[in-house]
Amino acid sequence: MAIATRTLTKEEMNSFHSRKFFPREIKLATDGLALIVNRANPDSLLSVRDFRRILTGEVKNWKEVNPDSRLKGIQVVFDNKNSSTVRFAMDSICGGKELAEGNVSALKTNQQVIDYVAKNPDAMGVIGVNWLGNRSDTTNLSFREEIRVMAVSAEDVATPANSYKPYQAYLFYG
């Protein structure tokens, strides 16, 4: 048995099939990404389109996302350069494109991402949803207090009405 965080690619499946091995995929769980920013950052909405543009380096400054922003360059931080979070961002959000060098980097752990974002107003962190929970909230309806969780929209322009934060209920429905 093997466990993967994604579906196997055609090339991977062909490799298995050429060796007379026919893997079956079974979905065990659904996870989600969370985009976090510093508490001082007033930007709390982002479209997937703008996130893609940030990750590929097309957008590098907060003013390009929000003309009223007083922040400067966007510094995106991931948990680890080899993590499934980075892989998902490259494959599913950026359509196979490489992540931009310069304003996108990786630390070593999710906790380091949270700490970095909490200390740097220009930072945006990308972490797994399971790292967001407020430990003092037994209902699991609030997020960690040291950071702000962004709401994300599939529409080109993010608004409060079309954007969603990564609450557990949304993960349940995939």
Label each residue range with its predicted role.
Residues 1-31, 36-174:
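Exported/periplasmic ABC-transporter solute-binding proteins
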